[in-house]
Swiss-Prot record:
Topology in membrane: Peripheral membrane protein
Known role: Produces ATP from ADP in the presence of a proton gradient across the membrane. The gamma chain is believed to be important in regulating ATPase activity and the flow of protons through the CF(0) complex.
One Pfam family, short name: ATP-synt
PROSITE patterns with a match to the protein in the record: ATPASE_GAMMA
Major location category of this protein: membrane
Family, similarity comment: Belongs to the ATPase gamma chain family.
Keywords of this entry: ATP synthesis, Cell inner membrane, Cell membrane, CF(1), Hydrogen ion transport, Ion transport, Membrane, Transport
Protein name per the record: ATP synthase gamma chain
Top-rank taxon: Bacteria
Subunit structure: F-type ATPases have 2 components, CF(1) - the catalytic core - and CF(0) - the membrane proton channel. CF(1) has five subunits: alpha(3), beta(3), gamma(1), delta(1), epsilon(1). CF(0) has three main subunits: a, b and c.
Recorded name of the encoding gene: atpG
Compartments where found: Cell inner membrane
A Gene Ontology BP annotation from the UniProt entry: proton motive force-driven plasma membrane ATP synthesis
Molecular-function GO terms, alphabetical: ATP binding; proton-transporting ATP synthase activity, rotational mechanism
Length: 288
């Protein structure tokens, strides 16, 4: 029964793997709920900052900001690539990378140079393999990323844009649609498009600004951009946990099917061995 022992060894190995994938599925399910709550909680803040900023810009048309300036021609662009730090999340990162590299190729075909800021280990590794110009990165952000870890890398791109070194900034991430569906998203971060600066007026009054409108505008623009990036990161993390939960469930189910097939093969091999032994015993008895 050497073959039978090998099959039993395979069964135990697959069972051990199944325990791991089932545990990862349960952990991802728990984390997914938390990341979804964090994602939903971040939206009202970003929307309120955008509303106040838009109201300020419309009420004070003379206000300007380097991050709001539009360029006539784009010679150099920056792309923020949001990805996961870990794998085992299905095709989540692959789909985002396809969107990212597609945009990079589109820009390069137009003669536009590209700088990259990576948020997540997988994206950083992919950009480095492609030998892109990575100007900033933040990895190992954890399950509850802090804004402090993002400010440094984002400041690099924002400063480049304000100083005229970059003419546009984009962000690529995985948008959370539902548990079973996550889509790669590409958005223009800078310059702010007109729909970002539009707000419906239901009143004719204006805010009182302390210390003054330009200082407040400087604060709001940066906070708005940071909140948009944080929202994208929160959506990407929710997508990551959902994709990992689905992937681990599929792996657990596949392991169960493999175990059933191996047990069937083992039972057939055992039955054949018993039949052979009985035949040998009967043949020996007949010979006597």
């Amino acid at each position: 029964m050497a073959v039978g022992k090998e099959i039993l060894t395979k069964i135990r190995s697959v069972q051990n793997t199944q325990k791991i994938t089932r545990a990862m599925q349960m952990v991802s399910t728990s984390k997914m709920r938390k990341t979804q709550e964090r994602m939903r909680a971040a939206r009202p803040y970003a929307e309120k900052v955008r509303t106040v900023m838009a109201h300020l810009a419309q009420a004070n048309a003379e206000l300007g900001h380097p991050l709001l300036a539009r360029r006539e021609t784009i010679k150099r662009a920056g792309i923020i690539l949001v990805s996961s730090d870990k794998g085992l999340c299905g095709g989540l990162n692959v789909n985002s990378f396809k969107r990212f590299f597609g945009k990079v190729k589109e820009l390069q075909d137009q003669g536009i140079e590209v700088d990259v800021c990576c948020l997540g280990q997988k994206g950083l590794a992919a950009a480095q393999r492609a030998r892109l110009n990575v100007v900033a990165s933040a990895v190992h952000l954890g399950d509850m990323p802090k804004m402090e870890k993002l400010i440094g890398p984002l400041t690099v791109l924002f400063r480049q844009y304000a100083e005229g070194e970059l003419d546009a900034v984009y962000i690529v991430y995985s948008s959370f649609v539902n548990t079973m569906k996550q889509e790669p998203a590409l958005e223009q971060l800078l310059p702010l498009t007109p729909h970002h600066m539009v707000v419906e007026h239901s009143h004719s009054w204006d805010y009182l600004y302390e210390p003054d409108a330009p200082t407040l505008m400087e604060f709001l623009v940066r906070r708005y951009l940071e909140s948009v990036v944080y929202q994208a990161l929160a959506e990407n993390m929710a997508s990551e946990q959902a994709a990992r939960m689905v992937a681990m469930k599929a792996a657990t189910d596949n392991a169960g099917n493999t175990i059933k097939q191996l047990r069937l093969v083992y039972n057939k091999a055992r039955q054949a061995a018993i039949t052979t032994e009985l035949s040998e015993i009967v043949a020996g008895a007949a010979a006597v």
